[in-house]
Amino acid sequence: MASNDKGLEEIPEGQIETNYDEVTDSFDSMDLKPELLRGVYAYGFERPSAIQQRAIKPIIAGHDVIAQAQSGTGKTATFSISALQKIDQELKACQALIVAPTRELAQQIQKVVVAIGDFMNIECHACIGGTNVRDDMNALRAGPQVVVGTPGRIHDMIERRVLKTDQMKLFILDEADEMLSRGFTEQIYDIFQLLPQSTQVTLLSATMPQDVLEVTTKFMRDPIRILVKKQELTLEGIKQFYIAVEKEEWKLDTLSDLYETVTITQAVIFCNTRRKVDWLTDKLTARDFTVSAMHGDMEQGQRDVIMKEFRSGSSRVLIATDLLARGIDVQQVSLVINYDLPANRENYIHRIGRGGRFGRKGVAINFVTADDVRMMREIEQFYSTQIEEMPMNVADLI
């Protein structure tokens, strides 16, 4: 922490300028403790999101970091992983303090820290208003390594000398703009005054209004600034078709015919249930098609292997459920087949959409039974898009 006020005044309000561009694109390359890495994968992460690729390493390296990121970008895990890497598990004292604007958010952060730190010997306590003060004091006396809470209660506990700050390494402010706009400015400043001078500061905020910038100039030393825009998914550049399949039972033959017509470089086939994924995998394997399957019942290790094979191209067709639609990075996939139309329209874009900046072309083919027509029309309306009947020359388009 420092009173260093050069360098940030020029930043236009609303958006910071990134001054750091190092990217680490896998968790394996972050030099994390083995038991922490195990927790990261067990939590279900496969590869780091944009903010995780940029912010985890500088925080671990000891830099003050300002990250401008919306929720949904993976920011909670960013600072949770960083905090867990930095703490000494043997030392029963608060070493990382996380402050959030609401009780709900504080509890949510605590759950993430506990889950990712599952294989580590750590305690994380949520210190929030509306709970019994005595219980809080007892929990803090036990010396949890990570404490997360709302500004009022945290300040109170430091004042009472129950939350000790002498071993504090890292102070994290999540949703700083929210916190300051809710009138917590004074408490935040007071907390800063009570922390050791050497404490490293990480600040996360969706917007950068003047009061947030003031905190950064007053209390941060040469901060690394990282701006992460939330990636918008788009259906642009994706040709969307449907095949009218009168009955559910006819879908399998339709899929086999499609296989014969089209040379598939790589495809993902989505079904709505795990049972259907397994059934379809068995049926296609029996017809001598090589496919791999993936759904939420599988162990993380097994899913990693399947994903690796698929990414490297050694497996060409992946059959999956929606659970994985959001996690599969399928930029290289030329064909997505919705064997079942998604049960809700939001998942449609997660299955077939692409990040706008990649602008990859692709083809999506929807198998539509008589019962699905209404859902398909809803999807078209919701996304203002057109799904046309699949033409005979579909092979030329893939």
UniProtKB/Swiss-Prot annotation:
Domain notes: The Q motif is unique to and characteristic of the DEAD box family of RNA helicases and controls ATP binding and hydrolysis.
Subunit structure: Component of the eIF4F complex, which composition varies with external and internal environmental conditions. It is composed of at least eIF4A, eIF4E and eIF4G.
GO molecular function: ATP binding; ATP hydrolysis activity; RNA binding; RNA helicase activity; translation initiation factor activity
Reaction(s) this enzyme catalyzes, per UniProt: ATP + H2O = ADP + phosphate + H(+)
InterPro entries, alphabetized: DEAD/DEAH_box_helicase_dom, EIF4A_DEADc, Helicase_ATP-bd, Helicase_C-like, P-loop_NTPase, RNA-helicase_DEAD-box_CS, RNA_helicase_DEAD_Q_motif
Segments forming a coiled coil: none
Pfam families from the UniProt entry: DEAD (PF00270), Helicase_C (PF00271)
Start and end residues of each Helicase C-terminal domain: 237-398
Segments carrying motif DEAD box: 174-177
PANTHER family found in the cross-reference section: ATP-DEPENDENT RNA HELICASE DBP3
The protein's Enzyme Commission number: 3.6.4.13
Organism: Aspergillus niger (strain ATCC MYA-4892 / CBS 513.88 / FGSC A1513)
Stored PROSITE patterns: DEAD_ATP_HELICASE, HELICASE_ATP_BIND_1, HELICASE_CTER, Q_MOTIF
Limits of the Helicase ATP-binding domain: 56-226
Annotated positions binding ATP: A69, Q70, S71, G72, T73, G74, K75, T76
Protein name: ATP-dependent RNA helicase eIF4A
Motif range (Q motif): 25-53
Function statement: ATP-dependent RNA helicase which is a subunit of the eIF4F complex involved in cap recognition and is required for mRNA binding to ribosome. In the current model of translation initiation, eIF4A unwinds RNA secondary structures in the 5'-UTR of mRNAs which is necessary to allow efficient binding of the small ribosomal subunit, and subsequent scanning for the initiator codon.
Signal peptide positions (record): none
Gene Ontology cellular-component annotations: cytoplasm
Keyword terms: ATP-binding, Cytoplasm, Helicase, Hydrolase, Initiation factor, Nucleotide-binding, Protein biosynthesis, RNA-binding
Location in or out of the cell: Cytoplasm
Family statement: Belongs to the DEAD box helicase family. eIF4A subfamily.
Top-rank lineage group of the source organism: Eukaryota
GO biological process, one term: cytoplasmic translational initiation
